[in-house]
């Protein structure tokens, strides 16, 4: 257990930097849609597959990553995986075809797969219990700084240096993150083989848990849906349906992600207070998700009149779902 506040802040900052990069890479395709579509003549299906490549690599690695984290710890697992992300990011910057872009995105997804769960694993061991929930909430806030950075800042740089140079800059940030992790993150006590067998048994128990099973469709369709909107489809919608130009679209994405940033702040502040009054997060989910459904329905009905102002409350109400999983 790490008791020194300065050391804890340093560890958090190093992990947060890596997670910031992870989410910058996750959502940057929404801002780059016009540039990539023009250069590679991409269809809507191509764009969807390109954005999904990140999540494909990311999701396939989650269970193996969890086992690796338990055995080898965040320092080694995040560090080595980020090398894969570094390769994927450089490869994306030099890609000459859609296939090259897609393969690179899959590599990026694989490489950043431990950027959240790795820190949470470390916090559980290194931080006092009273600080763990706060650190977890702040990590989710950091994610939205990455989302925000992928909007207007990227759009401003785009005509100046081009999207390929932007990815090379991100690659340099990944390299810095790898170095910081290797130097500043504590080592991990390697677990024995019997502990790995217990991990497999625990995984089996999770998949048999009725409450977990009941939340799987909710996470798949609802949280997955808002991620699809946030990281890709909100941008093309504003460009092709509402008639926004590239700057207006990036501005819309900026405010969507700023809303999400403050939403984590608000939910992080009020959830413990509501919980102390007997109002658990599941009750809040049951209230807020229907609100988001109504807003999504209005977006469909309004068509070209539904701009960023309609997508921002969807971002806010959907953020109750990940808070449920963190309990």
List PLM regions with ranges.
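Juxtamembrane intracellular "pre-TM" segments in multi-pass secondary transporters
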Residues: 2-4, 188-215
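Helix-breaking motifs and short loop linkers at transmembrane-helix boundaries and internal kinks
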Residues: 41, 73, 94-99, 302-303
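Conserved MFS/SLC helix-loop-helix module at the cytosolic interface between two early adjacent transmembrane helices
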Residues: 61-94
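Cytoplasmic helix-loop-helix junction between adjacent transmembrane helices
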Residues: 104-142
